[in-house]
């Protein structure tokens, strides 16, 4: 009898609707990411707290919490979220509005965090990314017949995004705005909106709007000028990008060796955050970077495959939304680190030190 129960339990485990390739890919990315956080953060952690494992231990704790939460969340039928898709929009607005309340705290010149206690803080924009995916998945399913039209399809549904983007720009948080806009555009095109409508709107409104946002904010304009020639201000705004390029260049084909980076010794500010990919390139070289990017490509491939095989449109859009979230962040982060686009403050999924952010992402 006990043997039959064990066999039934094992059979149930095998029949669990996990995509094992995806899960293994996530665990590999998490594992490599943790090793890189340990390596990249050790000098900063030692100088700040006297404990070279300070950042790593926190990242490890939250990664474990994320994996545990993932195992529980995976048991919930995704259709459950469809019932509450309208609430996701309101929760997003409330969370972003709370950043502007006394609960919000300014860090490095931007107000993006909610501090409940000294040890309990989080970035609402990280949660909002997922709430936007749920909201748009539900709304696009409901309005699927309107999507091929310009005003009822594109314009009407983009307008729902305006208050969210407006609140993000008040923080200011341009990188999160870019990611969310990118996710929504991908979801709407997959759902049935016409690409030519996006192209025309992007040329007529998107590009001029982005140019205005850069020109009207001095620090953004300075970042753009620095991007054009970082060596012009090598001791100022160009410092981080130039040091990143030094790290990537010195890595060569196979790297200088794990743990042997020189640029992490306070040359690159907070090397365990946005610029962790440059430390990866320095220590593990082109080969190490290629392995990581291939793993991200596998993640994206499995995400698209899940979207294609989803039993309904809502599931398909949820899958494509989450896949787009990771893909867009990877593309922007690597582009910034290699000086292919201006600095945006974009973190590398599964790698950058994020605490609660790593939990949200894994879940």
Feature-to-residue mapping (PLM):
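A juxtamembrane structural motif centered on a specific transmembrane helix
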Residues: 2-10, 331-363
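N-terminal membrane topogenic signal
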Residues: 10-26
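Hydrophobic alpha-helical transmembrane segments of multi-pass inner membrane proteins, especially
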Residues: 24-31, 35, 39, 48-240, ...
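Short linear Ser/Thr-Pro motifs
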Residues: 39-42, 261, 352
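Glycine/serine-rich anion-binding loops at beta->alpha junctions
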Residues: 118-128, 170-172, 252-257, 346-358
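Transmembrane helix boundary and interhelical junction motifs in multipass membrane proteins
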Residues: 173-178, 256-261, 271-273, 286, ...
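TM-adjacent membrane-interface loops and short helices in multi-pass inner/ER membrane proteins
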Residues: 226, 230-273, 277, 287-288
């Amino acid at each position: 009898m006990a043997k039959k129960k064990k066999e039934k339990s094992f059979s149930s485990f095998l029949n669990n609707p996990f995509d094992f390739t995806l899960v293994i890919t996530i665990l590999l990315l998490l594992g490599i990411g943790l090793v890189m956080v340990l390596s990249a953060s050790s000098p900063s952690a030692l100088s700040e707290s006297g404990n070279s494992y300070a950042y790593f231990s926190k990242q490890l704790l939250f990664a474990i919490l994320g994996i545990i939460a993932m195992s529980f969340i995976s048991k919930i039928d995704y259709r459950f979220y469809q019932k509450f898709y309208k609430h996701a929009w309101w929760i997003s607005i409330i969370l972003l509005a709370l950043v502007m309340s006394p609960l919000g705290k300014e860090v490095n010149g931007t107000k993006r965090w909610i501090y409940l206690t000294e040890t309990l803080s989080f970035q609402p924009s990280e949660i909002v990314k997922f709430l936007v995916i749920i909201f748009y998945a539900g709304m696009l399913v409901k309005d699927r017949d309107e999507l091929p039209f310009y005003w009822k399809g594109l314009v009407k549904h983009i307008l729902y995004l305006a208050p969210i983007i407006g609140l993000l720009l008040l923080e200011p948080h341009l990188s999160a705005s870019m990611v969310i806009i990118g996710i929504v555009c991908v979801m709407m095109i997959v759902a049935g909106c016409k690409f030519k409508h996006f192209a025309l709107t992007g040329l007529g409104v998107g590009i001029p709007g982005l140019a205005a946002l850069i020109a009207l904010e001095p620090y953004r304009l300075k970042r753009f000028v620095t991007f054009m020639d970082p060596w012009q201000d090598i001791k100022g705004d160009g410092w981080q990008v130039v040091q990143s390029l030094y790290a990537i260049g010195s890595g060569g084909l196979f790297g200088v060796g794990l743990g042997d980076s020189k640029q992490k010794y306070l040359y690159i500010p907070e090397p365990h955050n946005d610029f962790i990919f440059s430390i990866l390139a320095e220590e593990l070289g082109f080969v190490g970077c290629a392995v990581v990017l291939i793993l991200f490509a596998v993640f994206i491939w499995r995400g698209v495959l899940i979207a294609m095989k989803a039993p309904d449109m809502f599931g398909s859009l949820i899958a494509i939304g989450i896949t787009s979230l990771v893909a867009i962040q990877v593309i922007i982060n690597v582009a910034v680190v290699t000086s292919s686009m201006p600095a945006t403050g974009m973190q590398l999924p599964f790698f950058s030190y994020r605490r609660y952010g790593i939990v949200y992402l894994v879940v």
